[in-house]
């Protein structure tokens, strides 16, 4: 503690007369340093998000992955993950090969074995887009079973993304290397990357693979957990789990599996979520065609914690939790009521997510948001009539003189006609 007129050394000497003060200060400094070094949320990825060192790695000639599997056990109380991964590799080169895998920087790798024999491995200091590179040398044998164990906290280079790496009894999301180490330089076999994923979670949680596959319960345990299993065919993968409510809806020639958090159930029912999904799917499929990312039969609509707007893939699409708050559903700029705001957000499955059309130029009168507003207007006009649609979707954008407002709300970049 600095003392007036005594300088740093004099102040230290006077403060040291009470020993607990400098000891407490030193302890606090040590705790600050330890907290910074052990920060579980932030990795040290290359800040250049366009870097593609890992993505552009040359594949190994003569090495292929025939099958892989993972057994994952998140600890929802501590917010950590433990798992075992196995890779069935075919090495036709007759030589030892170095296999590279992407691992989340927060995991510790251990017990790496090839055909049951422990082998050396190394993890790179360089990190890129939430991954470090794990390198292992597999033997010259033609058939190699590579197994390893991993565990820790999956770090994130975007720590401000709420829910991005949440691991709790209500919600979790494990993406790619956070789910299991991802093969970087091994090509798929003739059948692709067939994979079996098992995950053990509290019984109240529902497991939702972000793909066309469905997870099923294969075991129930005495400690109040269940083991889920699903099959997929890709090098990585994304898995959501949480306390979800599932509604099955027939619309647009598809079976829609609509998943949303149980805490939003009252809001969803009051907003007529199921009816909104049905109206949007029927209208948009009839006027614009099928979704670009459906599998032709089923589509999962999954409400995430927060994903900055959502995204879509093979047979699944993500909806942002923020879209379904009472505040957003009451936004008059997106509709005349909660049900219409719900329609607006669902229309983004067609206009948005980077699937249905190229990004518009800065001078284009249309955008994903503009097309969504216009489509919402057309759906509401069909459901409730032209007068209602004009009142809530045209007149509100006009001033008292009947002309368009100079600065309409940013939610809509077009004027319905």
Listing of model-derived features with the role each one plays in the protein:
Residues 248-364:
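Juxtacatalytic substrate-recognition/specificity segment
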Residues 84-101, 105:
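Ligand-binding face of N-terminal immunoglobulin V-set domains in extracellular IgSF glycoproteins
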Residues 365, 369-417:
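Acidic/His/Gly-enriched intrinsically disordered linker/tail segments
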Residues 22-33:
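Bacterial N-terminal signal peptides
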Residues 5-24:
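Bacterial N-terminal signal peptides that target proteins for export
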Residues 104-166, 224-225:
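A surface-exposed beta-strand-loop module
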Residues 86, 149-244:
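Extended, low-hydrophobicity, Ser/Thr/Pro/Gly-biased non-transmembrane segments
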Residues 36-82:
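N-terminal, polar/Ser/Thr-rich
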